[in-house]
Structure formats: C-alpha cells, structure tokens
C-alpha cells in the first residue's frame, strides 16, 4: 500500500477515499474489535492490514511513529493525514455522520471538542489495549470516559535563527525590540481554540499589552507553528515567541535554537479510536502502541510524553494543564479571532 503524508488534509483524505473505494471498502461503519483477549485483537488487526491516523502533531514525529509501529507490527501498514484541528475535526464529524470512515484513530488538542465528544461518546469506541491500564501511564489522570487517552502535549517556547540572532533570546519580552521589525514569526489563531488559549496565556503572563507591542513590529503571520519553524530555518524570520521545541531541526543541523520561558504554555493531545473506523482492531492496536515506551519515544521528541523518562521528551504530559474550555467556546474563539485579525491584519 502506498503511503501518503501531507498537511493538506482535504487532498489526503480524498486520496484515501479513492483508495478505499478502489479496494472495495464498505461505506458503512465498522464493528467493534473482536471478542477475546489482546492476542485475538492483534491477530484480527493483522488481518485488517492497515490503519489510518488523523493528527495535528508534527510530521517528523508522525513519520517516526509510523516507522516504529510498522517495525513492531510488520503486518499492519500505518498511514496518517496531518492537518490542523480545524481541518481534521470536521472530517471526523463528516465520516461519523456518513458512516464512511477513513480515519481509524484521531489525535487532537481541541479541549472543547474533546470534552463534548468524550461526554457524548458519539465518535469513539471504548479502549481495550492493556498498556492503557499500565500504572506508569497513570490512566486515572490520562483517560477520559474510557474513550480519550492522553497521548502527548505540545510545549511552546522561543525560537530563533542562530545566524541572525547568535545570542538567542530568553524571555518573550526580549522580542519587543525594533531590531526585529518585520522579522518575528507568529501563528494565526483564527478558528483555533488552542492557539487562542496560547495568545490569552501570553497576555496574562507576559503583559496585557504584549501582543499590541508585537503588532507594532509588523510580524509575519503563518498558519501553524510548523510553518514558523520552517521560516526560522530559512531565515525568512529570525525570532518567534511561539514555537514548539526545535529538537528535530537542531538535530538535523538547521541554523536554529530554542528555549522555554519560565512560564511556558502547553496544550495536551488526546486521541480516540473512532467508531466509524473500518479497521477497528488495528485502531485499538495503534492506540495501545501510542502509549508504550516505543510509541512515546517515536512520537514525542521535543514534546511532553505520557510516560516517565522518555528520551527526547521535554516534559511530562500529565503536568501540562488543559485549557479552560469555558473561555474557549466557539463564540469566544470567534470573538478573539476577530479581535486578532483587527490587530494584526487590520
């Protein structure tokens, strides 16, 4: 099976749908995993032969997860579609409504969506993997309604191009400097609950007028933190107050570096096994693998991991507080998005 990995979720999902149709896939939602022990689920997963993940995680980490999963389960091909939460979540809803599941496992940071979906149980099936009950995973603190499980957490900090800013920066306030006019990279939060929370957090912790001062420096706006990291690497911008730890980029020799401020902002990813999955057993196997030591090391270089002592992780995901969803209702996200557009795009 040919793999595809892209940030263009609509294109990728369409391609997957064509492939599913060509293989004679059913248009109705699949059943629950087989009855029996975990070995029976794994055997059934190998019979299904493939699994699809929708995620807003970093492509390099999703590539690493794919390689690690396929090494552990060579009989199961893993594919993923990478997109933002605002792209992926509506597709999950559509696939659930139509019963034509493309995704098998869904990984998102949208706290409001997670809470509502976990409460309704509409989109997911109960988890059965043994590692989701492991004491090191701390299921009491990591699983919501036996449907959503903590998988990772993004921690945001400061990033800079080492050629342009050899001394780096250490606080978000360091970016408020005329020398960075037109060279600051920021993420457009429009429609993204997580990024709206980030902007509000910075204003609360680094000054209510922080973003007004940044706006005066004519920052360059990007659709995601990944795009900001790429712009830092190319030198299109020289600093950013909002990047995920640039561990992968530094390891690859890119001219960038990063640091966490004293009060870094973070947001957790939760995942679910989708009820519209056409590969219900493979979905459970992938979900379980994601919380094993191998899965966590692959997925969380530069991120917070759900297990202790994971090489490459920068924090423990259980220590990253979830956003206050009362402040992230669709109405409040829309209101803040409009305020942001007025400030930065006038």
Task: Label each region the model flagged.
Residues 24-26:
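Bacterial signal peptide processing site
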Residues 157-164, 199-200, 267-282, 289, ...:
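A bilobed periplasmic-binding-protein/Venus flytrap-type ligand-binding module shared by bacterial periplasmic
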Residues 52-66, 78-96, 100-236:
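Extracytoplasmic ligand-binding site segments that recognize negatively charged/polar headgroups
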Residues 112-116, 237-257:
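A ligand-binding cleft/hinge motif common to bilobed small-molecule-binding domains
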Residues 153-154, 180-190, 213-215, 221-222, 252-277, 289-312:
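Periplasmic-binding protein-like
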């Amino acid at each position: 099976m040919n793999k595809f990995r892209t940030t263009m979720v609509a294109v990728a999902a369409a391609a997957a749908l064509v492939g599913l149709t060509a293989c004679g896939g059913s248009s109705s939602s699949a059943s629950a995993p087989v009855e029996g022990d975990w070995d029976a689920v794994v055997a059934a997963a190998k019979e299904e032969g493939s699994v699809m993940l929708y995620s807003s995680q970093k492509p390099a980490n999703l590539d690493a997860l794919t390689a690690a999963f396929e090494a552990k389960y060579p009989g199961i091909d893993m594919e993923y579609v990478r997109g933002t939460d605002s792209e992926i979540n509506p597709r999950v809803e559509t696939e659930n409504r139509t019963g034509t599941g493309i995704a098998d496992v869904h990984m998102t940071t949208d706290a409001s969506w997670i809470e509502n979906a976990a409460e309704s149980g509409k989109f997911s099936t109960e988890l059965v993997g043994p590692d989701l009950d492991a004491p090191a995973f701390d299921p009491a603190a990591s699983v919501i309604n036996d449907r959503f499980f903590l998988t990772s957490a993004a921690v945001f900090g400061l990033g800079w191009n080492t050629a342009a800013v050899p001394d780096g920066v250490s606080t978000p306030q360091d970016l408020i400097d005329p020398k960075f006019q037109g060279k600051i990279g920021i993420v457009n939060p429009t429609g993204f609950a997580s990024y709206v929370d980030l902007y509000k957090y910075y204003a609360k912790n680094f000054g209510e007028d922080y973003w007004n001062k940044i706006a005066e420096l004519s920052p360059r706006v990007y659709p995601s933190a990944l795009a900001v990291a790429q712009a830092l690497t190319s030198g299109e911008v020289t600093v950013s107050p909002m990047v995920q730890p640039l561990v992968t980029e530094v390891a690859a020799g890119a001219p960038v570096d990063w640091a966490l401020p004293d009060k870094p902002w973070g947001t957790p990813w939760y995942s679910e096994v989708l009820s519209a999955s056409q590969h219900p057993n493979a979905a459970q196997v992938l979900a379980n693998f994601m919380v094993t030591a191998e899965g966590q090391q692959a997925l969380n270089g530069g991120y917070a991991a759900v297990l202790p002592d994971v090489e490459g992780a920068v924090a423990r995901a259980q220590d990253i507080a979830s956003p206050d969803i009362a402040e992230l209702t669709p109405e409040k996200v829309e209101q803040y998005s409009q305020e942001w557009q007025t400030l930065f795009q006038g």
